[in-house]
Amino acid sequence: MSKPTDQLYYANGVDSYIAETHAWRTPETCSTYMLKYVKKTDRILDVGCGPGTITVGFPKYVPEGEVIGVEPSQELLDKAEEALRKEETLKKEKINNCSFRLGSIYKLPFPDNTFDIVNTHQVLVHLQDPVAALVELKRVTKPGGYVCCKEADLLSACVYPKEYEHDLLLQSQARINLHGTNPTAGRSLRGWAIDAKYVAENIHSSASTWCFADEETRKWVSRLFIQRVLHSNERLDDDDAKDQSLRKRVAEAWQRWKEDSRGCFFMTDGQIVYKKEE
């Protein structure tokens, strides 16, 4: 059996237009479901940390602990280091407990039972073998510690008015068809965890929703995805001519939707918090 690939999402290299659509993520916008489990002395591991904007938001919650972000891409780690240098809260409060490591989610460079909190955000959705990844996340978690995972469920996406739905969801569909993204990761999380030998009664499952509807958020999300569809290396079709035509069509649809006061886009994320048996 071939070894699973770490980085399907950036298989063709890190793309700044894709990374920008991830850079708005922070613990406060994306990880509130797990913050109540965090203690000020905890060691947190953020696996698949991407551009690091969630990772660098954790240190203020663990001023007496430590935060480490892990990525298999040095290019993304460079972006994460830049995010760390820019984090004003850490400078102001003189917190210096965050670092980054190159590593694979399938073989994390840490001993067993090392971290109090092990976190992933929109990582398993892109993996060939999420169950193997969950086994490894649990391995490095201390007994009594927590594995926290949040993953999008792309098939839950809804767009209104209906006239925009097909074109606005073409990017998600292309990630499913061409880039290996799992369309039902959010709803699969609990099942994957049980397949990874997590104890069922120790898994707390929940869900949250992204909603882009008011004028400000429509403008913001449209700008990000128009730039992404026009300029990133994320293809919509294998045929060059069709790809260019679809890119233009999707960008125009985002522009029209942005200006439509009826516009609404929402999607569900599945979430699990697993307490490792002591």
UniProtKB/Swiss-Prot annotation:
MF GO annotations: methyltransferase activity; S-adenosylmethionine-dependent methyltransferase activity
Regions crossing the membrane: none
InterPro entries: Methyltransf_11, SAM-dependent_MTases_sf
EC nos: 2.1.1.-
Record bears the keyword Cytoplasm: yes
One example of a Gene Ontology biological process annotation: methylation
Top enzyme class: transferase
GO annotations of cellular component type: cytosol; nucleus
Keywords associated with the record: Cytoplasm, Methyltransferase, Nucleus, Transferase
Subcellular location: Cytoplasm; Nucleus
Domain of life: Eukaryota
CDD domains attached to this UniProt entry: AdoMet_MTases
Signal sequence bounds: none
Function field: Probable methyltransferase.
The name this protein goes by in its record: Uncharacterized methyltransferase C1B3.06c
Organism: Schizosaccharomyces pombe (strain 972 / ATCC 24843) (Fission yeast)
